[in-house]
Amino acid sequence: MILCNLALEIEHLLDEDFMVKTMDTCIHEVMDVFLRPELGGLIVETLNADNTLVDCFEGRHMNPGHAIEAMWFIMDLGKRLNRPELVVKAKDTALKMLEYGWDKEYGGIFYFMDRNGCPPQELEWDQKLWWVHIETLISTIKGYRLTGDPKCLEWFERIHDYTWSHFKDTEHPEWFGYLNRRGEVLLPLKGGKWKGCFHLPRGLYQCWQVLEELSKYCLLYTSDAADEGL
């Protein structure tokens, strides 16, 4: 998953043929191996050595945030390689994982899930984490920008409202990282072993870039419509 993103960041430093092969390999592993049609198009975290599903805690472990994050990497690769069908597939997969992982009772996206609906091994499974929601903001707004699917915009607005109203500290800098299932601050710490200066600035920057593009497009469309007397 990370290699999908890294490939685009360092492709100007390495041989073009090597990078294209690397991108193709990454796309295949994510979209043809870990994405499982028999699970309705959901993405799993762990497989047997022969790429079959395994029925154990690790094999049933689902991480909606990871899958949704991976999909905006794939969208970027699809754009770079001029493969619109890949962009659409990544967008559709992101929406499936989002609908799957969304907590319909309290809102927010579950941290971990079990694909068979069994109790997850991880005790923190029902927490709501900052990075999961930030990466989802990127995926949904990129999906809307690249495909025009209104579902992406609807989800972006829903996730945006949840994220800014729950994770942002209104009194002090930096965001909270860990909420309980009800969306209440579980840990007041702003940094630690797993929460560093990465997901938040990258996420805000990525969203800003896409929203700037959309803003320019809207201004251009409005200007053209005015010129035509619409």
List where the protein language model places each region:
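Glycan-recognition and catalytic cores of secretory/periplasmic carbohydrate-active enzymes
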Residues: 1-220
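Single conserved hydrophobic/aromatic residue that forms the stacking wall/gate
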Residues: 221-230
